[in-house]
Amino acid sequence: MKTHEILFQTLSQADDYVNGEQLAKELGVSRTSIWKAIQRLEKDGVVIESLKKKGYRLVSGDILLPEVIASNTQLTVTLNEECHSTQLDAKLGMEAHKEGRALYLAKSQSAGKGRFGRDYYSPDQGGIYMSLHLKPQLPPAELPPYTLMVAGAIYKAIKNLTLIDV
């Protein structure tokens, strides 16, 4: 993982401020690298409070960490900074005969597609763009209810993890 990703994990697990010197030592990098990693996180929308003599504290925000998602889900996770469409990424993965159980994520997509190839509005900031490639052992006629079940599960997960009613 990159320095800013490890720093994010460290700050998100801390109960209070973490001293910059302590962070540099834990991560095995310079204080300048910590400062640059904080700037990168802030650029990605993460709010970090900084106080002299105390250190840094994560206030709000989140980032996508494919390694963490993969280790908790048993999925192959691919993250693109930007793509045309995560649906297209998943389709290309299927056409390349990649194994199922793959999650395709993007921070932004320029030509998002939804179900049935419909255009999907996807602004650059604030979205979660993903497509899941599975190979269910069901006949196609039994698959439509799964879209609703997945949507409900995603809603519940976001609400429980963020306390935001989406």
Model-derived regions: residue spans:
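N-terminal lobe of the biotin/lipoate ligase/transferase fold
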Residues: 2-163
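Active-site phosphate-binding and catalytic loops of NTP-dependent enzymes
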Residues: 166
